[in-house]
Amino acid sequence: MEPPLPTPMLLLLLLLLSSSAALPAPPRTPRHSDGMFTSELSRLQDSARLQRLLQGLVGKRSEQDTENIPENSLARSKPLEDQLCLLWSNTQTLQDWLLPRLSLDGSLSLWLPPGPRSAVDRSEWTETTRPPR
């Protein structure tokens, strides 16, 4: 006795199932959230890369500077692990750039370069530069 032949419906179902599994999925259209994620990810990677670079540079610089400092002064000036320590050879230059400056109109300005202030007072300067009437 031979097994019964499959019905045409069963053959059609098998054909559909086998062909749909062989086809690749259609490509997904890019979404706005994909761009936001990749943008944020690349920004974080750049930030981590910059942080590693700074730690490498500062670490090397700190090691070079600590070789020249006696051991007893290291105990009190050792920075914490989480702090970023930049060692400047000229502290006066650093203070000049960090302290706020008075601009010509009397307001504080962090962007004026360091150095001695001009000998001309603000009122003298405005009188000499004022156009004639």
Curated annotation (Swiss-Prot):
Prosequence residues removed at maturation: 23-30, 62-133
GO biological process: adenylate cyclase-activating G protein-coupled receptor signaling pathway; dentate gyrus development; diet induced thermogenesis; hippocampus development; intracellular water homeostasis; negative regulation of neuron apoptotic process; neuron apoptotic process; neuronal stem cell population maintenance
Residues recorded with modification Phosphoserine: 62
InterPro entries in the cross-refs: Glucagon_GIP_secretin_VIP, Prosecretin
Tissue: Highly expressed in the intestine. Also expressed in the hippocampus, cerebellum and the brain stem in adult mouse brain. In the hippocampus, expressed in the dentate gyrus, the hilus and the molecular layer.
GO molecular function: digestive hormone activity; hormone activity
Keyword Signal: yes
Name the record gives this protein: Secretin
Organism: Mus musculus
